[in-house]
Amino acid sequence: MLCSLLALLLGTFFGVRSQTIHQWPATLVQPVGSPLSLECTVEGTSNPNLYWYRQAAGRGLQLLFYSVGIGQISSEVPQNLSASRPQDRQFILSSKKLLLSDSGFYLCAWS
């Protein structure tokens, strides 16, 4: 059933001066109840502030998590998702069991 699928559209966004940010996988559709792992990596910069956003159908971007350093993660919205930052330029978004309310487009950003 279409309603039981979670669609994630991810992309690669480019910064300036050879600085890049990559999200992996680029596109993902997961059924409700399955696990999730999305990875964001930044190249060409050090000590970036990293952010995970979600855009649900018909809504604007919602900040989910932000991190100012390794192991320093703040959550804006309590939910079924979690984030980890195992390395300076890596930020991982995950869920052990997706809910229908997790549906949306996910975007990683840095500053």
UniProtKB/Swiss-Prot annotation:
It holds the Pfam family V-set. SMART domains: IGv (SM00406). Glycans are attached at N80. Disulfide bonds join C40-C108. One of its GO terms (biological process) is adaptive immune response. It comes from the Eukaryota. It is found in: Cell membrane. The keyword Transport does not apply. Residues 1-18 form the signal peptide. Residues 19-111 form the Ig-like domain. Keywords: Adaptive immunity, Cell membrane, Disulfide bond, Glycoprotein, Immunity, Immunoglobulin domain, Membrane, Receptor, Signal, T cell receptor. V region of the variable domain of T cell receptor (TR) beta chain that participates in the antigen recognition. Alpha-beta T cell receptors are antigen specific receptors which are essential to the immune response and are present on the cell surface of T lymphocytes. Recognize peptide-major histocompatibility (MH) (pMH) complexes that are displayed by antigen presenting cells (APC), a prerequisite for efficient T cell adaptive immunity against pathogens. Alpha-beta TR is a heterodimer composed of an alpha and beta chain; disulfide-linked. The alpha-beta TR is associated with the transmembrane signaling CD3 coreceptor proteins to form the TR-CD3 (TcR or TCR). The assembly of alpha-beta TR heterodimers with CD3 occurs in the endoplasmic reticulum where a single alpha-beta TR heterodimer associates with one CD3D-CD3E heterodimer, one CD3G-CD3E heterodimer and one CD247 homodimer forming a stable octameric structure. CD3D-CD3E and CD3G-CD3E heterodimers preferentially associate with TR alpha and TR beta chains, respectively. This is T cell receptor beta variable 30. It comes from Homo sapiens. The lineage of its organism: Eukaryota, Metazoa, Chordata, Craniata, Vertebrata. The gene is TRBV30.
